[in-house]
Amino acid sequence: MSSAITLERILALQAAYIRCIDNNALESWPDFFLDRCLYVVTSAENHKNGFEGGIIYADTKGMLTDRIAALREANVYEKQAYRHILGLPNVTRNDGDSAESETPFMVVRVMHDGKSDIFATGVYLDTYQVAGTDLKFARRLAVCDSSRVDTLMVLPL
């Protein structure tokens, strides 16, 4: 496979990423990221104001792996699942070695009793890089439209 970053490769990465989360294959989730990466879930207001912290903050693949281990082994939470709906990514920069895009998202949370609610809407601000032959996230900021977030965000967006 070519090492070029194309829209087709970005779409394939995003589709596989969402499938991983929506199908509860969370142990594979960190593999979508470089070893040195940034994953943040934040609000649009905090992002606009330049606040770096987030509802979820991880700056290494190891931190992402630890988050899933804690979710599976230590955290106590009501059983739930996500269903993601994505818009098409708008590639805002592509210099060959890395690329950036903005992708709108909506996440529906399905609770164990079958109740479904819109859980989050917003935009992914992504930076991609090629690692070997694979396209990976160097950075994924999930910028939520609302600053109102459930007190326990269990699953990654």
Residues of each region from the PLM?
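A generic "alpha-helical surface" signal
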Residues: 8-11, 55, 62, 119
